[in-house]
Amino acid sequence: MNRLIRYIGVGKYIQEEFALDKAGEEAILLGRKAFVLGGKTALEVVRDKLEASLAEKGISCEFATFTGFCSPEKIDAYTELFLESGADFVIGVGGGRAIDTAKGITYRTNACIMCIPTSVAQCACYANVIILYRDNGDPLPYAWNLIQPVNVILVDTDIIVRKCPVRMLSTGIADS
C-alpha cells in the first residue's frame, strides 16, 4: 500500500545577524500593509528596526499587542483587528503563544505570514500546527493544522543573543 506523506514546511528561512534589516525586502513579496502581532516586550525589541525596514520598501504597518493565551476566541478577536486594519499580510513577533495566534489569523483568512522569533525556547515559527488553549491557560485537547506554510521566518541572531532572556536561551538550547 502506498501512502502519501504530506509535510507543509516553511517557504523561506533566514537566520543571520541583523536579519531584521531584511524584513522589508522579504515582506514586499507578501503585501503592502502588515498587521504586526507580538507581545509587549517582543514589540519593544523589534519595532523600530522592523518599521524602518518595512518603510524602506513602502510597506505600512499596524501594530497590535498580544496578551494572554492562543485560544480560538483570541484568534477570532485578532482576526477582526487584522480585517479592520486593511492589512494584507501578518507578521508574528515574539514567543510561541504570540506566533501561534498570528498563524491563527492566517488560518482564518489565508493571508501570508512572516514570523520573527525573539526567543529560541519555542518552535512555533516552524511548526505546521497551532497549539490552542482556553482563555484561562488550560490546553485544549486538539490543535489546528496549518493549511498553508509560514511564508518567511526571520531569525535575527543579534536579537536572540543580546535581547533574549538567559532563562529562555538556556531552555531553548536544552529543548533542542
Over which residues does each language-model region extend?
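A short, small-residue-rich loop immediately preceding and capping a beta-strand
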Residues: 82-120
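Short, glycine/charged-enriched secondary-structure capping and boundary segments
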Residues: 49-52, 78, 105-108, 128-131
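Short C-terminal domain-edge/linker segments immediately following a structured domain
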Residues: 65-70, 93-95, 122, 143-149
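ATP/NTP phosphate-donor binding region
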Residues: 1-89
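Short glycine/serine/threonine-rich phosphate/pyrophosphate-binding segments
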Residues: 20-21, 42-47, 97-104, 122-126
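Glycine-/small-residue-rich active-site loops that bind phosphorylated ligands and cofactors
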Residues: 42, 69-71, 97, 120, ...
